[in-house]
């Protein structure tokens, strides 16, 4: 009888160890834009792993990949800094706003120009303004850098928020790059360039972030809507996602999760609660389909 008791006890202990190991080994994978990763996902996922033991692996690839891979079942979660587009490969996902970012217009640190108007930005990317002296700077040619394609997170949102035209072509003289990372590196190393990025990423680089309409790109100005080029950041999940994904969503939307987001300098949903009406109007002005954002 004693041997049987010992046997059952050993099995019970083994069962506990197996369950514990399974819980520790549980893993979710996330893929998406680098801006979203830097804005919140890196620190939120680290805190979630410490709290629950669930490991979250992070991969880049851009906002479009963050949406498409989740839709195709290749990733549990994604990150995007743009809304869903009406494309077949982007169907079947939910985009959950978790915080607010803003487009940043960046240049080299040595550039004495501090501020641009929206009209000046339009003319620069149209190729109508080609020299920094035309906007109060020195006699140096402007080197425009931009993301390839028109549906990247930064590229799409720049076209909608600044130009009100998602199909807008930038100047043919623009230097095109594959992602925001290389664009930011060019701004760090190359004098007289100008390009769009996201503040959540750009502020961690050695670049100059230009004011727009005299407004600094600060947490307070984004939250108050004073800085005009704000946009939501999204967590992407599959419709009908499993419970582990839903648990993470609950965490990131909780006060604890939002506090982590704020600690990263990203505007929280609460602090940016008054931005939605303006943002919705901006999207409609750009001809964006209601319900996609």
Model features per residue range: what roles?
Residues 25-100, 104-293:
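Exported/periplasmic ABC-transporter solute-binding proteins
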Residues 14-23:
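C-terminal segment of classical bacterial N-terminal signal peptides
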Residues 1-9:
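Bacterial N-terminal signal peptides that target proteins for export
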Residues 9-10, 237:
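Hydrophobic H-region at the start of alpha-helical membrane spans
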């Amino acid at each position: 009888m004693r041997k049987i008791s010992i046997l059952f006890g050993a099995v019970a202990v083994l069962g506990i160890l197996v369950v514990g190991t399974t819980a520790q080994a549980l893993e979710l994978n996330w893929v998406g834009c680098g801006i979203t990763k830097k804005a919140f996902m890196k620190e939120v996922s680290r805190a979630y792993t410490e709290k629950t033991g669930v490991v979250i692996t992070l991969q880049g690839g851009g906002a479009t990949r963050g949406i498409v891979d989740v839709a195709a079942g290749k990733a549990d979660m994604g990150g995007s800094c743009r809304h869903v587009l009406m494309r077949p490969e982007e169907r079947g996902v939910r985009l959950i706003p978790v915080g607010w970012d803003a487009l940043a217009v960046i240049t080299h640190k040595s550039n004495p120009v501090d501020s641009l108007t929206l009209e000046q930005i339009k003319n620069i990317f149209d190729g109508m303004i080609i020299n920094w002296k035309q906007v109060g700077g020195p006699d140096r040619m402007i080197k425009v850098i931009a993301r390839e394609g028109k549906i990247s997170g930064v590229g799409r949102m720049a076209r909608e928020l600044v130009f009100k035209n998602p199909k807008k072509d930038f100047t043919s003289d623009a230097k095109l790059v594959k992602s925001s990372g290389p664009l930011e590196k060019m701004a760090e190393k190359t004098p007289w360039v100008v390009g769009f990025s996201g503040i959540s990423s750009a502020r961690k680089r050695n670049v100059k972030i230009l004011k727009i309409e005299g407004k600094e790109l600060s947490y307070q100005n984004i939250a108050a809507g004073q800085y005009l080029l704000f946009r939501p950041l999204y967590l992407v999940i599959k419709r009908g996602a499993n419970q582990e994904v839903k648990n993470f969503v609950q965490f990131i939307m909780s006060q604890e999760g939002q506090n982590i987001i704020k600690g990263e300098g990203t505007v929280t949903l609460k602090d940016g609660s008054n931005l939605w009406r303006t943002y919705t109007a901006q999207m409609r002005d750009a001809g964006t389909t209601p319900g996609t954002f």
